[in-house]
Amino acid sequence: MSLKVIILAAGKGTRMRSNLPKVLQPLAQKPLLSHVISTAQKLTNEPIITVIGHGAQRVVDVIGTDGIQYAEQLEQLGTGHAVVQGNPHYNDDDTVLILYGDVPLTQQNTLTDLLNLVDDIHPLALLTITLDNPSGYGRIVRNQHHLVQAIVEEKDASFEQKAVQEVNTGMMAVKGYYLKKWLGQLSNSNAQGEYYLTDIIEMCVQDGFEVHTTQPASEMEVLGVNNKSQLQSLERQYQAQLAEELMEQGVTVLDASRIDIRGDLTVGQDVTLDVNVIFEGTVVLEDHVSIGPNCVIKNAVIKSGTEIKSFSHIEDAQIGQNCEIGPYARLRPGTELSTGVKIGNFVETKKVQIGSGSKVNHLSYIGDTEMGAGVNIGAGTITCNYDGVNKHQTVIGDNVFIGSDSQLVAPVTIESDATIGAGSTITKDAPAGTLTLSRSKQLSIKGWQKPTKN
């Protein structure tokens, strides 16, 4: 006896007006289906049974096969028919939890409450919700004793039934033996000509069982996505929830409606986030980190006391303590900064290691470089790392001073305590403790006449 989860993910999603299958549409840059699978995997170590149909191979390619058993629904004949495709993957004594690939935000504790309602004498339990506007949902029909009798789809509902505000979310937990039994009794004699999974509720009652129900804490947990408008609305609700969770952890969020978390964000104490900040992938912000407005941070670790100023883009980078980045800085993959480094406006770095206290303050490109501590890089300095075919390394020792508008043509080494004169193009190694420069001799031509316009 174990828990098996079936996720229905075969729908086309015509109203999305997209070539991408509906369950692969992104919520916080993660496919809708991936959200559901992640929650399911918190409930069981068993493979997640995922019923696919439209765009099946694309779904497999994106989601992968790790911890998942796929079942294909070749014809779209209704939710009951979809669940039948999962029958070979569970046993009679299993409890089967049925979820939907386009309902991404159901919480683990809500599903645990649902599962706790199922036992040998209560083989079926439903997740329902009461809505002010139940239009479009199947209605929960109860008798005078408030016991569930059936679910009636809106297209088949009477006028009185349409007035019911308690609706079906689609999610249920069922004992495997009874699920197979009732699925085998389904008929498609309805307005849609489909096999409704919801018809098994009436069968359960007819077999003498009570159907127990529970409800989620929030309507957002059971919201499905059928079009881009609903997807955008759910995105904003989800981001608001994530912002609220950050503030509960002590983060100062200057405007909760203008922050996007599109991955996993870990924060320390006294973190401050300004407006229009986007986090992607896996990001760690340690204590006393400040992120200015309009920054994009992806797959980065930012250590304590560091300030990221406005309009900075950081990707696949490790930033040390008490650094100062930006504004308008771009730290590309492979950037590793030690303590107290300053990267200023319009500076781009890639595949660099920069030592403690070094400064690259203005208008520079530093790539494929090992830089020591206490280095000052003047404005307009470029490491010329690419010869048209291969990338080459620049090595800069400790306490080096690079004058403005210099070009370091790799491969080249600037040894510790060296000084490079402004405007130099360095093609050979610069010795330690020396001044190295390469400039044309300055000339002042007397009697020079400025050209005049013809």
Swiss-Prot record:
Keywords: Acyltransferase, Cell shape, Cell wall biogenesis/degradation, Cytoplasm, Magnesium, Metal-binding, Multifunctional enzyme, Nucleotidyltransferase, Peptidoglycan synthesis, Repeat, Transferase. Residues 250-454 are annotated as: N-acetyltransferase. Pathway: Nucleotide-sugar biosynthesis; UDP-N-acetyl-alpha-D-glucosamine biosynthesis; N-acetyl-alpha-D-glucosamine 1-phosphate from alpha-D-glucosamine 6-phosphate (route II): step 2/2; Nucleotide-sugar biosynthesis; UDP-N-acetyl-alpha-D-glucosamine biosynthesis; UDP-N-acetyl-alpha-D-glucosamine from N-acetyl-alpha-D-glucosamine 1-phosphate: step 1/1; Bacterial outer membrane biogenesis; LPS lipid A biosynthesis. UDP-N-acetyl-alpha-D-glucosamine binds at residues 8-11, 22, 73, 78-79, 100-102, 138, 153, 168, 226, 332, 350, 365, 376. Residues 1-228 are annotated as: Pyrophosphorylase. Residues 229-249 are annotated as: Linker. Binds 1 Mg(2+) ion per subunit. It catalyses: alpha-D-glucosamine 1-phosphate + acetyl-CoA = N-acetyl-alpha-D-glucosamine 1-phosphate + CoA + H(+); N-acetyl-alpha-D-glucosamine 1-phosphate + UTP + H(+) = UDP-N-acetyl-alpha-D-glucosamine + diphosphate. Its cofactor is Mg(2+). Mg(2+) binds at residues 102, 226. InterPro entries: Bifunctional_GlmU, GlmU-like, GlmU_C_LbH, Hexapep, MobA-like_NTP_Trfase, Nucleotide-diphossugar_trans, Trimer_LpxA-like_sf. Pfam families: Hexapep, NTP_transf_3. Signal peptide: none annotated. One of its GO terms (molecular function) is glucosamine-1-phosphate N-acetyltransferase activity. GO terms for biological process: cell morphogenesis; cell wall organization; lipid A biosynthetic process; peptidoglycan biosynthetic process; regulation of cell shape; UDP-N-acetylglucosamine biosynthetic process. Gene3D superfamilies: Hexapeptide repeat proteins, Spore Coat Polysaccharide Biosynthesis Protein SpsA, Chain A. The active site is at 362 (proton acceptor). Homotrimer. Catalyzes the last two sequential reactions in the de novo biosynthetic pathway for UDP-N-acetylglucosamine (UDP-GlcNAc). The C-terminal domain catalyzes the transfer of acetyl group from acetyl coenzyme A to glucosamine-1-phosphate (GlcN-1-P) to produce N-acetylglucosamine-1-phosphate (GlcNAc-1-P), which is converted into UDP-GlcNAc by the transfer of uridine 5-monophosphate (from uridine 5-triphosphate), a reaction catalyzed by the N-terminal domain. This is Bifunctional protein GlmU. It comes from Hydrogenovibrio crunogenus (strain DSM 25203 / XCL-2). The lineage of its organism: Bacteria, Pseudomonadati, Pseudomonadota, Gammaproteobacteria, Thiotrichales.
